[in-house]
A protein has these predicted regions:
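Short capping/connector residues at structural and topological boundaries
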Residues: 34, 168-173
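Short linear motifs at protein or domain termini
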Residues: 1-102, 213-224
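Mobile beta-alpha loop/short-helix "lid" or hinge segments that flank ligand
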Residues: 60, 64-65, 156-158, 173-174
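Conserved amphipathic alpha-helical segments that form helical-bundle/coiled-coil interaction surfaces
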Residues: 85, 102-169, 177-190, 195-206
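Anionic, Ser/Thr-rich low-complexity intrinsically disordered regions
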Residues: 13, 178, 206-207, 221
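Short arginine-rich
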Residues: 205-214
Length: 224
């Protein structure tokens, strides 16, 4: 296909990557769907090289699988795999909260300014709240000062993003997130480690169940 002559290959690869990722996130491309490099090149009006770059990047990030004879496939959702990732995430975050409760300088003012606000000041944009939710949980781990723990936690965050973000497509879930984040922060600030950990664990477990429900529903609707 003829590509726009002004576009550099690397920015083209970025555009193809972003578009495919959006297609996967919005269920236009469904888990198990197969396609070839040629299909993508034609649809995106791009040459093979940037398309290949974009596809391999999505494969590295766990969104696609490559089959050398039959092209590419959107990786089927494996809820056992997501379950395992959520379990590891809980372990890391509980350890972080426990450590934060013992620290003199917690440095959580920034998180409080976002989550402990009047109802009228709460945001309701799903994408924005989803990004802020990630920043909240990553922020708790980063606040411990353990860079290796934060790195591992962020890797898991990236792997579960595809299903986790669906939690914020419902207003009731956004409201619950504000309430729960506020309570978790309160408990940490009061250095009540057991309570903070219990609140956090319940918060993540409920979110995990909601996400599974919403994902299965969205897949059923998309498959018609």
């Amino acid at each position: 296909g003829a590509r726009k002559p002004s576009e550099r290959p690397d920015s083209l690869a970025e555009r193809v990557y972003q578009q495919l990722k959006d297609d996967i996130f919005d269920f236009r491309l469904l888990p198990g769907d197969r396609f070839s490099e040629g299909d993508v090149a034609e649809r995106m009006q791009a040459s093979r090289t940037p398309v290949r770059q974009a596809l391999y990047r999505l494969e590295r990030e766990g969104y696609l699988e490559v089959f050398f004879r039959s092209g590419w496939q959107v990786r089927p959702f494996d809820f056992n795999y997501f379950e395992e990732l959520y379990d590891v995430r809980i372990v890391l975050e509980l350890a972080a909260v426990n450590r934060l409760c013992g620290m003199a300088e917690q440095g959580l003012e920034g998180l409080g300014a976002i989550w402990q606000v009047d109802e009228s000041a709460r945001l309701d944009d799903a994408q924005l709240v989803s990004a802020l939710d990630e920043a909240f949980h990553c922020g708790l781990v980063q606040a411990t000062g353990n860079a290796e723990m934060a790195r591992m936690h962020y890797e898991i965050t990236e792997k579960i993003r595809i299903i986790r973000r669906l939690d914020f497509t419902q207003q009731a879930r956004i409201a619950a997130t504000y309430e729960e984040h506020g309570s978790i922060l309160d408990a940490i600030l009061r250095r009540q480690s057991d309570q903070a950990q219990q609140l956090l664990k319940t918060h993540i477990e409920v979110s995990k169940q909601e996400v599974r429900k919403i994902t299965l529903h969205r897949l059923a609707v998309a498959r018609g």
